[in-house]
């Protein structure tokens, strides 16, 4: 009798003393679901330049230059362009270009970018602040992935502000293994995928319903630059 009561007491202690898992089940965190995919509409008529509409956002046409009155001062710049991302309440300036990795010498970079040869090009995006955080600008640095990295969804870049970092990985899971077919760029916060984009002739976009409104705008801006790339 006493042994039975003791065992029951120990079981209760172990039950209530075990760490509580505060994470949602893995299935609930899957990004690639129908309800989180945004339809991408492309407007590319005979007499109009290409624009994109996805989710609540629309881009202007791409302008092939760095915008005036900005402080982008890289010495080596290739294929610069800029556009505006618009929703119902604001518009955000987005600029993009290619520049060698050496342009970021002296700046902190994650290991997967730091190890890139100095002359290798990086795709660079500068995103102006949103209405609620007008002074906070974001930048994205992205290297060109190797197909072996795509096979394993390896990190190839970073989207960051002064106090926030979002990892960017890339994979070919919608295409063929050992290939560059249907490269999907995935944005991750604390290891969880929160957005993804497949550029190209048949683009696809996913954005998690769990991200905050301001983060969603920044992700949408980065996605727009990758669609235009």
Annotated model-derived regions:
Residues 4-14:
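Sec-dependent N-terminal signal peptides
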Residues 18-229:
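Intrinsically disordered, low-complexity proline/glycine-rich segments
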